Amino acid sequence: MAAKEKISRREHILQCLAQMLETNPGQRITTAKLAAEVGVSEAALYRHFPSKARMFEGLIEFIEDSLLSRINLIMDDEKDTMRRCQLVLQLLLLFAERNPGISRVLNGDALLGENERLRSRVSALFGKIETQLKQILREKTLREGKGFELDEAMLANLLLAVAEGRIAQYIRSEFKQKPTEHFDEQWGFIQKQLLQS
């Protein structure tokens, strides 16, 4: 029973942190403010997380688990190259849209002034997503014998940059300009250009 309560409190702390990141854009979250939001003392926060960095790591673990597991499902369920790319980008954009506070962690905005390893971990996550996109694009060349005009690594970088740009706009607009807005039309254009190359 005690373990269940502990997990529940940890999750509650992370949910409050994500909520504060959403409702206080551009502001740094202190442990004092977070403790007040959770309704506990700062000491109680530290019983569940040894540091504020560990709290952010908890959010990053949630991001990694959510995105990477779903990307694996996309890879298993879908075989078409362009559809795979579309679904991976759409997943990233929808995840950011549905988790506005957490999108600030993805963007790095919420990590300014925090431990460098947090930014490195988010950067590594984007590196994994870019590698996955590159692999998807390379498989098209192997399957069909025809590649793209640009190197797959450059294309993967470009596709991920589009998604990262949409997330940055979402944060800059204080969550008003949805990252998925017009994505289907924009993807249609991008896909057409890729297939013509």
Curated annotation (Swiss-Prot):
Main subcellular localisation: cytoplasm
GO molecular function: sequence-specific DNA binding
Cysteines paired by S-S bonds: none
Domain spans labelled HTH tetR-type: 7-67
Localization: Cytoplasm, Nucleoid
Protein name, per record: Nucleoid occlusion factor SlmA
Subunit architecture: Homodimer. Interacts with FtsZ.
One of the protein's GO biological processes: cell division
Pfam family, one: SlmA-like_C
Keywords associated with the record: Cell cycle, Cell division, Cytoplasm, DNA-binding
NCBIfam families referenced in this protein's UniProt entry, alphabetically: PRK09480.1
Gene name, Swiss-Prot/TrEMBL: slmA
Xref: InterPro entries: Homeodomain-like_sf, HTH-type_Tx_Regulator, HTH_TetR, NO_SlmA, SlmA-like_C
Function: Required for nucleoid occlusion (NO) phenomenon, which prevents Z-ring formation and cell division over the nucleoid. Acts as a DNA-associated cell division inhibitor that binds simultaneously chromosomal DNA and FtsZ, and disrupts the assembly of FtsZ polymers. SlmA-DNA-binding sequences (SBS) are dispersed on non-Ter regions of the chromosome, preventing FtsZ polymerization at these regions.
Keyword Ribosomal protein tagged: no
Protein family membership: Belongs to the nucleoid occlusion factor SlmA family.
Record feature DNA-binding region, as residue ranges: 30-49
Any Gene Ontology CC annotation: bacterial nucleoid
